[in-house]
């Protein structure tokens, strides 16, 4: 076996790239990059009824969005069926596999007998050493592996440790169905061998498959790749992650406003640790990642923790990068807000200018976009209930009073507008908040916003005065 590490991510395109699959891809990618090896991508599309092009596209898009690039061309398993069949025939010719003519009724009876006797259902090997001349007429056989019946099958797993199975408990699995289609077990082994895979990293729900596949590798005289079966992801309640926990596809996390770097960082900490470090740059992840530091216990997905981490990434991101990230989600979230991509240049400039104040409190790009509502809202602004309450007769009176002071400013900035509003409040004998709150309501339509005077600076003199005029027209 070559010393170069080759991992593979092998999703089935029967649905979108879910969060567990994304973490599996990340671990494969990190291990490959850490060791200077390669990560290959194989689409296991042998289930023709459930595999869809939409799911394939979603998987590829999800990986690309997460920044997980693969090496070489994508391998499609279904296209390799002839190769899989040829290997089954090789095993048959070598006496390491055999034709089985057991009927569906016989197999059903085996299962029923096993249940009645309180043992796991398994094929009883009735055609293992039987003369093919005894084959019943009109029955198309399957090809079964002639698996060892004594001793143990052992997997030295990088995460689970030494795992053993008594061979007497593992039956002769089907390699080729009666219609000539290869089974998943055979296809995976042949593809992993032909692709030069040296390290398999996948969920621990595949652990039993490891025994089956190891037997096929051995029957073919091929090296068995090293294996690492990582724990599944559970919800906060300890149950296996499902849609009721919000186990969404990666594309949904994108549209919810999570940054790919933040999601990568969160996913790497689900089951893997490096001391007590929580925040990792991509370079730090690659340098530190080690399969020996992956735990065996199921990791719990915590949306609040993800949101907090995403907020940290937002606060430390460059302002222009955040605006660019917002533009990428506008095709899905923009129409309901009256926005489309690309943003108009003047709005884009205003967003970048406003970003230092906007990003301090936002935990997602959606929150960021909604807190910037005042920049793209159409005049006259729609007021929420709290803002409307602030613009009572008294509030509108304050607006009418402060407006001439603002109009007279020779220059317009956060500092100059703050000075003017403070001066007006003092001359009017009222507190700053009694002027600032109606101003905020008139300029943003809400009672919470980024710092008021930053808002005024970004809106500019003309737009600020126009919005004040909408709420407190001059007589």
Curated annotation (Swiss-Prot):
CDD domains: GluRS_core (cd00808)
Keywords for the protein's UniProt record, in alphabetical order: Aminoacyl-tRNA synthetase, ATP-binding, Cytoplasm, Ligase, Nucleotide-binding, Protein biosynthesis
EC number: 6.1.1.17
Subcellular localization, as worded in the UniProt entry: Cytoplasm
UniProt-listed InterPro entries: aa-tRNA-synth_I_cd-bd, aa-tRNA-synth_I_codon-bd_sub2, aa-tRNA-synth_I_CS, aa_tRNA-synth_I_cd-bd_sf, Glu-tRNA-ligase_bac/mito, Glu/Gln-tRNA-synth, Glu/Gln-tRNA-synth_Ib_cat-dom, GluQ/Sye
GO cellular component terms, A-Z: cytosol
Residues at which ATP binds: 243
Gene Ontology molecular-function annotations: ATP binding; glutamate-tRNA ligase activity; tRNA binding; zinc ion binding
PROSITE patterns: AA_TRNA_LIGASE_I
An individual GO BP term: glutamyl-tRNA aminoacylation
Motif ('HIGH' region): 11-21
Catalytic activity from the UniProt record: tRNA(Glu) + L-glutamate + ATP = L-glutamyl-tRNA(Glu) + AMP + diphosphate
Domain of life: Bacteria
Disulfide bonds: none
Family: Belongs to the class-I aminoacyl-tRNA synthetase family. Glutamate--tRNA ligase type 1 subfamily.
Function: Catalyzes the attachment of glutamate to tRNA(Glu) in a two-step reaction: glutamate is first activated by ATP to form Glu-AMP and then transferred to the acceptor end of tRNA(Glu).
Assembly behavior: Monomer.
PANTHER family: GLUTAMATE--TRNA LIGASE (PTHR43311), GLUTAMATE--TRNA LIGASE, MITOCHONDRIAL-RELATED (PTHR43311:SF2)
NCBIfam families xref list: gltX_bact (TIGR00464)
Protein name (database record): Glutamate--tRNA ligase 1
């Amino acid at each position: 076996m070559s010393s170069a590490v080759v991992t593979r991510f092998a999703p089935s395109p029967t649905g979108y790239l879910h969060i567990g699959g994304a973490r599996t891809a990340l671990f494969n990618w990190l291990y490959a990059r850490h060791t200077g090896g390669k990560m290959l991508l194989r689409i296991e599309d042998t289930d023709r009824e459930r595999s869809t092009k939409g799911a394939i596209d979603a998987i590829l898009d999800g990986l690309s969005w997460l920044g997980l690039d693969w090496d070489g061309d994508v391998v499609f398993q279904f296209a390799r069926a002839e190769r899989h069949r040829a290997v089954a025939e090789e095993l048959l010719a070598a006496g390491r596999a055999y034709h089985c003519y057991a009927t569906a009724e016989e197999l059903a009876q085996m299962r029923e007998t096993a249940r009645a006797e309180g043992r796991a259902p398994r094929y009883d090997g009735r055609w293992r050493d039987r003369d093919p001349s005894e084959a019943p007429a009109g029955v198309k056989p399957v090809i079964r592996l002639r698996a060892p019946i004594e001793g143990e099958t052992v997997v030295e797993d990088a995460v689970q440790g030494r795992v053993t199975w008594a061979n007497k408990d593992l039956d002769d699995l089907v390699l080729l169905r009666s219609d000539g289609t290869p089974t998943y077990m055979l296809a995976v082994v042949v593809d992993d061998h032909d692709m030069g895979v040296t390290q398999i990293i996948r969920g621990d729900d595949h652990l039993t498959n490891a025994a089956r596949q190891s037997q096929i590798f051995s029957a073919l005289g091929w090296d068995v790749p090293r294996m690492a079966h990582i724990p599944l992801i559970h919800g906060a309640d300890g149950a296996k992650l499902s849609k009721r926990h919000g186990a969404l596809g990666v594309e949904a996390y994108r549209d919810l406003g999570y940054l790919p770097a933040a999601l990568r960082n969160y996913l790497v900490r689900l089951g893997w640790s490096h001391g007590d470090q929580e925040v990792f740059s991509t370079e730090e992840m690659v340098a530190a990642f080690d399969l020996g530091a992956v735990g065996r216990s199921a990791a719990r997905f915590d949306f609040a923790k993800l949101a907090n981490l995403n907020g940290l990434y937002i606060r430390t991101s460059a302002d222009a990068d955040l605006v660019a990230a917002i533009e990428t989600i506008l095709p899905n979230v923009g129409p309901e807000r009256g926005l489309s991509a690309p943003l108009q240049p003047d709005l884009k400039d205003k967003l970048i200018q406003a970003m230092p104040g906007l990003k301090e409190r936002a935990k997602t790009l959606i929150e960021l976009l909604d807190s910037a509502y005042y920049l793209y809202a159409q005049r006259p602004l729609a007021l929420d209930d709290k803002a409307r309450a602030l613009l009572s007769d008294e509030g509108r009176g304050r607006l009418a009073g402060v407006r001439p002071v603002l109009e007279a400013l020779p220059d317009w900035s956060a500092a100059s507008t703050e000075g003017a509003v403070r001066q007006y409040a003092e001359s009017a004998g009222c507190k700053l908040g009694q002027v600032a709150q109606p101003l905020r309501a008139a300029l943003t339509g809400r009672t919470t916003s980024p710092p008021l005077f930053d808002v005024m600076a970004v809106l500019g003199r003309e737009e600020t005065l126009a919005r004040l005029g909408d709420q407190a027209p001059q007589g």
